[in-house]
From Swiss-Prot:
Top-level taxonomy: Bacteria, Pseudomonadati, Pseudomonadota, Gammaproteobacteria, Pseudomonadales
Pfam families the record matches: Oxidored_q4
Family classification: Belongs to the complex I subunit 3 family.
Name the record gives this protein: NADH-quinone oxidoreductase subunit A
Signal peptide interval: none
Catalytic activities: a quinone + NADH + 5 H(+)(in) = a quinol + NAD(+) + 4 H(+)(out)
Localization terms from the record: Cell inner membrane
Length: 137
């Protein structure tokens, strides 16, 4: 059991760190509000676009396929993170780690094959319709 004075010294050091961070944030916000410009007007509230007046709404509706690509990127990015951690410790993990990594890669590859089979990765609607017709037969 750790002695109480050393535990308290670590807690106090963390509390001082948090106070320092909060103080630094307050200082930076205060200085920027004091030194920043205070001119208000209609032109200050409009976005700057090369000196041209904005036309239309800036909000665009994107296809759901872009969100699918973003989700696939996140999934396979996390996969790469786990595989990097395994690759760094491959000697320490031994055969058990190799089997675990193989199972992990196999499950993710099966998911990728399934997404491709149902047409989730197709950008063109024709290919998706053809694959779905084949799956229904």
């Amino acid at each position: 059991m750790p002695d109480v004075p050393s535990t308290l010294s670590h807690d106090w050091a963390f509390a001082v760190f948090l106070l320092g961070v909060c103080g630094l944030i307050a200082f930076m916000l205060g200085v920027s509000s004091l030194l920043g410009s205070k001119a208000w007007g209609r032109s200050k509230n409009e976005p700057f676009e090369s000196g041209m007046l904005p036309t239309g709404n800036a909000r665009l509706r994107l296809s759901a396929k872009f969100y699918l690509v973003a989700m696939l990127f996140v999934i396979f990015d996390v996969e790469a993170l786990f595989l990097f951690a395994w690759a760094v410790s491959v000697r320490e993990s031994g055969w058990v780690g190799l089997v675990g990594a193989t199972v992990f890669i196999t499950i993710l590859f099966a998911g990728l094959v399934y997404e491709s089979a149902i047409g989730a990765l197709d950008w063109a609607p024709e290919g998706r319709r053809k694959r779905q017709a084949k799956l229904k037969q």
